[in-house]
């Protein structure tokens, strides 16, 4: 079926290797709820459970519990330190999401730039039906884009404050 994507990007004043290590096996592994909060009428992450392995190892899975009481399964697809991280979301318990979305996923690219790291995050959702993409497109391109923007702003602020070599 059809897919819809959105991308956010940011310059982060932290060296790439240090930022990747702080984010992927760090924040993404055990502090996801600190950066993926309620935003743009969408639920945030409440907790994660049942993690099967380190969060920078492909094949590791977990259940992501959301603040609205729903959840989904997340699987690490690829992790290439310090350049790239990809994950896949399936088994959505929310009836509206489960009715619309076959699967979704995110890709993160990290590149060196003057003064730190350029982070690029693309999120893609695959619709279960041709009609579903009509409903899914504005949700992803407007609401989810805003959600991602706010999350990346929190990630940037925290990384620059917490990681050695950051600008603050």
Predicted regions span which residues?
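Hydrophobic ligand-binding cavity/cleft-lining segments
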Residues: 1-54
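A generic structural signal for beta-strand entry/edge sites
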Residues: 3, 82-84, 114-118
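Short, glycine/acidic-rich beta->alpha junctions
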Residues: 4, 68, 102
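Hydrophobic/aromatic beta-strand elements that line small-molecule binding cavities or substrate pockets
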Residues: 8-10, 72-78, 103-112
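Glycine-rich portal/gate segments that line the openings of hydrophobic small-molecule binding cavities
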Residues: 30, 41-99, 150, 154-158, ...
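Beta-strand/loop substructures that line and gate deep hydrophobic ligand-binding cavities in soluble
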Residues: 89, 93-149, 166-167
């Amino acid at each position: 079926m059809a897919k819809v994507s959105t991308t956010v990007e940011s310059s982060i004043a932290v060296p790439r290797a240090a930022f990747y290590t702080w984010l992927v096996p760090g924040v993404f592994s055990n502090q996801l709820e600190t950066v993926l909060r309620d935003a743009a009428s969408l639920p945030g992450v409440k907790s994660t459970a049942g993690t099967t392995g380190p969060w920078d190892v492909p094949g590791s899975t977990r259940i992501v519990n959301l603040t609205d009481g729903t959840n989904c399964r997340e699987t690490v697809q690829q992790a290439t330190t310090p350049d790239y991280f990809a994950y896949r979301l399936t088994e959505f318990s929310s009836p509206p999401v489960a009715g619309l979305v076959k699967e979704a996923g995110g890709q993160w690219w990290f590149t060196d730039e003057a003064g730190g790291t350029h982070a690029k995050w693309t999120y893609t959702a695959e619709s279960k039906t041709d009609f579903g993409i009509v409903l899914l497109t504005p949700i992803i391109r407007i609401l989810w884009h805003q959600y991602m923007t706010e999350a990346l702003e929190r990630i940037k602020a925290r990384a620059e404050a917490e990681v050695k070599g950051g600008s603050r």
